[in-house]
Amino acid sequence: QLHEVSADCGLLRRINVLDILYQNDLHRYTAKAYQPQAKDDEPRTTDILHLNDVDPLPASMADEYPLFEAGDLAVSIRKVDLVFVFDPDTGTVKWHTSDPLIMQHDPDFMGDGWIGIFDNNRNFMKRGRMLEGSRIVAVQPHTDSVDIRFPTPLSDPFYTDTQGKWQPLPNGNMP
């Protein structure tokens, strides 16, 4: 569930993410949580989604995202390799992707219509060699574009089996 809280910690709203998936015909993704052969985990009967990040679209950036409005939420659901943006007032999913992600985290609105995502790109070897490591993936929903921002051809690969956070530095680099 997503909880919206006030500045004084009062609960303003509760949103059931499974309801959002069902209302938008995205519930088919939940089947991935029950396919342990695709990952090294047991089938899930609890925490089938593993919601790991929510990022609201700030009003200052909203004009750069033609499909979205200020206050729309970017949501990452790791267990089913899904990122989507939805209107929390109506429950309408405006965009979603699961490709090219594997157990991702941390979608952030970057500006110029791009959403940056920390893609664990997890594989069963737990060393990252099979799929060439983790990545920072940028997607531009209104053009259906995908760009691997990091690693670059000039950088070393990196890998994190679980979790993960990214942020662009003021000079444009990514740690």
Which role does the model predict for each range below?
Residues 1-175:
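Histidine-/acidic-rich catalytic cores in large beta-rich domains
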